[in-house]
């Protein structure tokens, strides 16, 4: 089986592992193929693939119909909005993603932004560089309300980091689970209430 790699984030260790399992691995991840690449640019890159380890490039119905050898797209990430799911089903092409791999990193980035704004890091940094130790009122994160739109992998990871900072965490999702409220120290609310009550809002949805 020929595996064509288009994602830029692919290490030699992963390549060697796939080859040890009998896969032919072809690296085509330094061609500048990215989100929104037209079909006539992407097709020559993946036309001979049985499986694709994909980056952010777009897979439209017209392209997927032409990829007669393709059996699987493995998305290096958790988002799949650039891949037409109806066309995948029609062509019998499978789809996987790297769920459980990036959620923690995204949650850390979210908390970094919250703390940046809560502590006005930009102003404090400027003060220190100017040697002017101004007394500023910094609201901080404690006792602030964080609203999560979506409570899947990323939402739960953000909650796990925000609660220890003393933040009140509320969330809205289509299928709330009461067990999550107790497990993560959060509260399910309506979208209207979330927008009304939150000091910070995080969209953690596809």
Question: Residue locations for each model-derived region?
Answer:
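Short gly/ser/thr-rich secondary-structure transition/capping motifs
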Residues: 30-37, 54-55, 126-134, 182-188
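Phosphate-binding beta-alpha-beta segment of Rossmann-like dinucleotide-binding domains, i.e.
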Residues: 91-93, 98-145, 157-160, 164, ...
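Generic structural signal for small/hydrophobic residues in well-ordered secondary structure
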Residues: 18, 52, 73, 88, ...
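Residues at secondary-structure transition points
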Residues: 36-40, 54, 97, 101-108, ...
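Rossmann-like dinucleotide/phosphate-binding beta-alpha-beta segment
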Residues: 136-206
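An N-terminal-biased, well-structured beta-alpha scaffold segment characteristic
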Residues: 1-96
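Alpha-helix capping/helix-boundary segments
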Residues: 9-11, 58-60, 102, 154, ...
């Amino acid at each position: 089986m020929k595996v064509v790699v288009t994602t830029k984030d692919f290490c030699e260790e992963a390549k060697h592992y796939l080859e040890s399992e009998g896969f032919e691995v072809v690296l085509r991840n330094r061609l500048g193929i990215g989100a929104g690449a037209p079909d006539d640019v992407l097709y020559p890159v993946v036309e001979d693939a049985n499986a694709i380890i994909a980056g952010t490039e777009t897979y439209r119905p017209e392209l997927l119909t032409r990829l007669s050898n393709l059996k699987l797209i493995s998305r290096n990430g958790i988002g799949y909005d650039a891949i037409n799911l109806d066309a995948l089903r029609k062509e019998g092409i499978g789809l996987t993603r790297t769920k459980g791999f990036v959620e923690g990193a995204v949650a850390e980035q979210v908390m970094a932004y919250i703390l940046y704004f809560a502590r006005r890091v930009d102003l404090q940094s400027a003060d220190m560089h100017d040697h002017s130790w101004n007394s500023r009122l910094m609201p901080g994160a404690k006792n602030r309300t964080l609203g999560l739109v979506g409570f899947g992998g990323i939402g739960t990871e953000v909650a796990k980091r925000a609660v220890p900072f003393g933040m009140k965490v509320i969330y809205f999702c289509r299928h709330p689970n009461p067990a999550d409220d107790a497990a993560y120290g959060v509260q399910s609310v309506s979208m209207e209430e979330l927008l009304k009550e939150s000091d910070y809002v995080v969209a953690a949805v596809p």
